Amino acid sequence: MNYIDLFAGAGGFSEGFIKAGFTPVAHVEMDKAACHTLRTRAAYHYLRSAGNIAIYIAYLKSEITRDQLYAAVPASELQSIINLAIGKANNDKIFKLIDDRLNNREVDVIIGGPPCQAYSLVGRARSHNGMKDDDRNFLFIEYAKFLKRYKPKMFVFENVVGLHSANKGIYFRRMLLMFRNILGYEVRDFIVAAKDFGCFRIENE
């Protein structure tokens, strides 16, 4: 099964899906440094599957440069990383890049979660108005545009537990309304303790 990773960050979410046997179509991330990490991990997974992991190990030992590492991998693998900010200004370009990679295939899964600062308890506590004016509160609308366009069989929207209470729960209720009533998905929400799955974190998600 394939998947699209939105708000990909450095790719931690994707690592789990790849280990579970899913194939990435695209990782969309605005941060340049995070995209370098995504490309490096794409190179790792390709070289490992091709039996050429020695090239990756040479990179880890600084025996070859990052450019030399990338040169050992088909360009199509690295082109799965799309270094653009999700939003009105870039969505059409992102759609085009993803469409080209799909080549008329359907999308099985969309994963990802917008930046959590606007929803997190810590972020809201530090803000004079509880982050209510932060545009990141509404990035779930952009996420929904990808669901509407690609109609995946399922999706995983991940965020911090503070999403339940941000703006007295209004954002969360709007999100559920959009996913269920407008897009027609059966939605289940639940809290996961990351530490219960071998992660060195205390946050719940």
PLM ranges: what are they?
Residues 1-9, 106:
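Conserved class I S-adenosyl-L-methionine
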Residues 3, 110, 155:
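Receiver (REC) domain switch-region micro-motif
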Residues 7-10, 112-114:
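Class I SAM-dependent methyltransferase "Motif I" SAM/SAH-binding loop
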Residues 10-22:
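Conserved SAM-binding loop of SAM-dependent methyltransferases across substrates and taxa
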Residues 12, 94-97, 139-142:
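Well-ordered alpha-helical segments embedded in enzymatic catalytic cores
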Residues 20-107:
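Glycine-rich phosphate-binding loop and adjoining beta1-alpha1-beta2 segment
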Residues 100-104, 119-205:
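Class I S-adenosyl-L-methionine
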Residues 108-116, 151:
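Short coil-to-beta-strand
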